[in-house]
Every structure is written in structure tokens, then in C-alpha cells.
Amino acid sequence: MAAIKPITTYKGKIVPLFNDNIDTDQIIPKVHLKRISKSGFGPFAFDEWRYLPDGSDNPDFNPNKPQYKGASILITGDNFGCGSSREHAAWALKDYGFHIIIAGSFSDIFYMNCTKNAMLPIVLEKSAREHLAQYEEIEIDLPNQTVSSPDKRFHFEIDETWKNKLVNGLDDIAITLQYESLIEKYEKSL
């Protein structure tokens, strides 16, 4: 009973954004947090870097460059998603089109928010990220915990609980529903 789209293998276009300490306010500025739904935040992702003061695209911002248009894998620096615990940051990146984020490290809360929103956060050393950033596309194999370029494969760690959720397309509600009969049995015993 999948509630989110399962992630097993994924091949996609990359965009490098090698800044360290990108916080949730840089990912989605608080001025844009006026919605209660998870959608509609994509146009505001990286708002202050993505657009010039006149509202036009900033040509120096990597995701705006023609060679990176349509990228679904973000390769970034250390301590990604630090700052406040706003889940809107994960919503904005997902709505923008990212499915995988590869960083040197993540804020714990941001990491959890990614997995809860069917995005795979991957931690890799800087040398691996720099290698992968040379290619237009890379491939992720979640069951085997690898990220591959055409000439090299890197292993990554992920907690088995998060891996199981993502591979099987399970959100928290779907996991709870797996125990529905036990819950009903307990309720009847009260």
C-alpha cells in the first residue's frame, strides 16, 4: 500500500550548487510561507539567488543556466538545510523538481523532512560530489545504496528505516495502517 512514489533506482540530470551552510531561509524565504498546502512553493525556491532585483532570472545562478535546466538531482555543499525546522524548504525543493539531494552533510530535521516528502538525501564526501558534478546525468540505486557516474560508483549510508520507507513508498500514515488490525484489536480490549 504505497502512499508515496517508491524510490528504487533513479537516473537524472544534475545541477551543482557547492555552497556550504545553505539554510532553510535561503532555500525558501519566510516571506513566501503563506500557504498551508505542500504545493506551489517551487517558484520561490532559492528566491534571493535565483532572481535579479527586477524579477528576471539570475544568469549566474547554476540552476538557471541552460545546461542545468530540468535537473532533478542537486549536488551541494556541507550542512545543507541548516537553520529553522520549516518543512516548507523540503516542499519547495520537491515542487521545484528535485528528487535527490547529495550533500556533505544535512541538518537532521531537514534530512527527515526530505525523506517524509519522498526525496532522497544522500551524504557523500566532497571528492565524490566533485566527481559526480562533472557529468550531466548520474544514477542512484537505493536498495544497493550506490550513486554512479559512467565511470565510478560511490556507496552511501542510510538508516534502514528511511530506506525501507522510500523503497516501499511508505509515508507515516501508510506505516500506521500496516498495524490497523492490531490497533483495532487493542481498541476493542479497552
From Swiss-Prot:
One of its GO terms (biological process) is L-leucine biosynthetic process. GO terms for molecular function: 3-isopropylmalate dehydratase activity. It catalyses: (2R,3S)-3-isopropylmalate = (2S)-2-isopropylmalate. Its EC number is 4.2.1.33. This is 3-isopropylmalate dehydratase small subunit. It comes from the Bacteria. Keywords: Amino-acid biosynthesis, Branched-chain amino acid biosynthesis, Leucine biosynthesis, Lyase. Belongs to the LeuD family. LeuD type 1 subfamily.
